[in-house]
Curated annotation (Swiss-Prot):
Its cofactor is Zn(2+). This is Zinc metalloproteinase-disintegrin-like uracoina-1. Belongs to the venom metalloproteinase (M12B) family. P-III subfamily. It comes from Crotalus vegrandis. Its EC number is 3.4.24.-.
Amino acid sequence: HQKYNPFRFVELVLVVDKAM
């Protein structure tokens, strides 16, 4: 089941920020 995880979004933002 898919459950929205805000921490997953934060982790994605950190990865994108590090890439840029």
